[in-house]
């Protein structure tokens, strides 16, 4: 028996088809969210870097997953505030420094710095939680990279420094969960190794008497950032083949000791 014979007339057949259309369309699978169009977080309008000088209570702890419990703050700190403008994020000296002045481990072997990163929206309200809560911590991670320039075949070319011993600095993630609680709160758990974020981290400078640009990049991955059970190192966001983009990428100037050797790349750029 045909569908037309069952319905009895073309008019009844048309009514039946109109009734079935909503049922069929309701069974379609839900389209996946396009993270390129819907990041599930706002874009920051302000970035605040706070650098706090500290001492390692036991220098041997540096290679054994140090936490905030392993340092003692000296009370010296610098703050850099960058505001989003038509020319990108620019540092305001009225609201902080334009570069960070630090000491190398050659000058003081136990010196280390706590680097804290805060993002604010257009209303100047803290929005760090948007990159962490509701599973966003699984796809976000800060990286702290350095790039070098070489004059090859008549052109200046830029390369990422991929060997950690050539960086001139070293970094450790010291994030805690919950992210908005003190590290020594009863509910706080150290997650700097298992789930590196970089909103809080320890950095020290192993090369003496130089200045450079530290590229601080917040990765937004389109898949879990932990690859085969491993997190990517702080100095290379391309260490594993993870589909990603950057939410933020900023060059921050550091002057180590007297800053005699200039590795910012600005001299090469001006001579080109």
Question: Where are the regions that the model predicts?
Answer:
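Post-signal-peptide N-terminal segment of Sec-exported extracytoplasmic proteins
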Residues: 50-89
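A beta-strand/beta-hairpin structural motif
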Residues: 82-102, 158-202
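Exposed beta-sheet edge/beta-hairpin loop segments within beta-rich domains
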Residues: 38, 99-113, 179-243
């Amino acid at each position: 028996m045909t569908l037309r014979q069952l319905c009895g007339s073309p008019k009844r057949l048309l009514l039946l088809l109109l009734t079935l259309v909503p049922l069929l369309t309701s069974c379609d699978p839900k389209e996946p969210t396009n993270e390129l169009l819907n990041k599930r977080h706002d874009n920051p309008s302000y970035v605040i870097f706070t650098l706090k000088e500290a001492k390692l209570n036991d220098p041997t702890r540096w290679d054994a997953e140090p936490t905030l419990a392993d340092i003692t703050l000296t009370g010296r700190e610098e703050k850099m505030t960058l505001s989003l403008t038509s020319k990108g994020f620019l540092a305001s000296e009225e609201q902080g420094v334009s570069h960070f002045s630090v000491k190398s481990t050659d000058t003081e072997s136990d010196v280390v710095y706590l680097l804290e990163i805060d993002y604010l929206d257009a209303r100047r309200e803290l929005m760090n939680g948007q990159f962490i809560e509701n599973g966003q911590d699984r796809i976000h991670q800060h990286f702290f990279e350095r790039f070098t320039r070489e004059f090859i075949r008549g052109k200046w070319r830029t390369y990422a420094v991929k060997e950690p011993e050539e960086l001139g600095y070293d970094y450790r993630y010291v994030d805690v969960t919950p992210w908005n609680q003190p590290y020594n709160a009863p509910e706080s758990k150290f997650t700097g190794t298992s789930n590196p974020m970089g909103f809080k981290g320890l950095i020290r400078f192993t090369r003496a008497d130089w200045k450079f640009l530290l590229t601080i990049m917040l990765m937004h991955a389109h898949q879990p950032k932990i690859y085969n059970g491993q997190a990517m190192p702080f100095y290379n966001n391309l260490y594993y083949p993870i589909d990603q983009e950057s939410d933020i990428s900023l060059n921050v100037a550091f002057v180590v000791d007297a800053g005699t050797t200039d590795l910012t790349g600005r001299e090469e750029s001006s001579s080109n």
